[in-house]
Amino acid sequence: MSKNGASTVHSTADATGAVNASNAGPASQAISPNGIEHTLDAGRVAVHDPAIVEENGVYYLFGTHRRCARSTDMVHWERFDNNLSRDPYALLGDIWQAWPKQDSNPDLLGNTWAPDVIWNETMGKWCMYLSVNGDQFRSVIVLLTADHVDGDWTYVGPVVYSGFDESNLWNTDVPKVLELEPKTDGTVGYDLTRYLSLKDTRINAIDAAPALCEHGEMWMSFGSWFGGIWMFKLDPKTGLRDYSVRYPLVKDSSDPYYGVKVAGGYWNSGEGSYFIRENGWWYLFMSYGWLGRTGGYQIRLFRSKSLLGPYVDQNGNPAISYGEIPDNQERGTGIRLTSSVQWDGGPAELADVEVSQGHNSAIRRSKDGRMFLVYHTRFAERFSEGDDEDYESHVRELLPTSDGWLVAAPYEYRGSVAVAPTGIADITGDYNVVLHDQHTFFNGKQEDDGTYVGINRPTRYTFHEDGRITRGEIVSFFDTPDANLPRSTDGPITCGSWKPLSGAVNGFNCCASDAEIRLDDVTYIARFATLPREIDGKPVMTFSAIGNNVCIWGSQS
């Protein structure tokens, strides 16, 4: 969150100019399967599970394994260090010894996961919520504070535990929260069964996402896979849990220790929750699948009128699971914002095709109110030397639609924001269109023709001035008597229509960017905008749209 405040969870400010690429360190090398070295942009940065905040016109990324980076333009990044990255044992050694450390996982260095940072106005401090991970889900989220967002950091204490049972319960704050007293026979005297079941409430205390709601209250979501995503209230005076708030035990809704359930559960994948507010809606982002290159990691979107939910997708499917959904990364719940795409606007090479995109944060910059999605991605055919995978942090602009959803821009943000069309003539023309299929993902397997499963390639459509959408080459009218086509001459097959929107739709005011697209019997609400292509920087008209719970992208060819 920005120090200068805003109505969103993490508001931001923008600044012109950029960190000089020469300050970002040398360009790194990655290798494709054919042995060709791929030189990465020196302004790029690899921060896993990136959380973004802003202070005084500078953007900061914080990620897993204490990686930090900063930028003045969200394009050119440089790494930086602080006392947490240099010597984590000095800050976290005691809590590591007290809870997560086990013989099966003895090193703290690989177990500092997914921090998030927020400005606490009451404390006058930056608060970092960091996961200290252990085997068997014996993890703890801790609080660190700093006067400046780049550090140095001071350890405050634990916020929430996971992986407890009767043998170690008294080493946590669970008895305090549940108001338990030790029994004379050594038993707990409380049914902990639900905390031992991965299909119930046995979660991993990782992936903290602090949030400041519109009423000024601080909350924190957390959790990973298994038992779902939960949220409880924080005390703004301490930054720790608000122990005065009690939560009832209600199946699939609330838990006395973990608070309010907002998503997932029943062993269904789902982690990396994040929230942002826009036009009276709270939007929940979370990642389905597994984070590896072939794991199908992907961002799904839900919304609610309340920070605490209930969250649903466009088709009304709840974010909370009420039963097992095997391979839910291949199912239709949640709007999939991005996928693996290869088209002529870029990326053109498989070494640059994004796969396994996820664990995002989001930010609103105070300069103009524009929102941005920040996430990490792996690549179809890019591997670090000595490692089987390579990853980067990427940024895309988030665009609100006229029916109250958010879509991601078709091209990565490289300094140029989305520019609205000035009229119909800007929109008409040929488009390459890709669909972010919820039911498939890049898994490393190849078809008989050598193309990868799960990499989406475009279909060519033409948007006509009269509102028709056609596809393909000219077809003889007499060869298609059963096509029910609105034409009486030879020509391309009409497969849809489009029209600009004006006035108000579902309570939202439309602008020149808003349009309705009817394509293959699905109605999409679209945002048209000029953006530079990734492959060459050429400005082209694009659109991002949502319909029937599915996102599509289009780019003029």
Q: What spans do the regions from the language model cover?
A:
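Carbohydrate-active catalytic/glycan-binding domains of CAZyme proteins
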Residues: 1-557
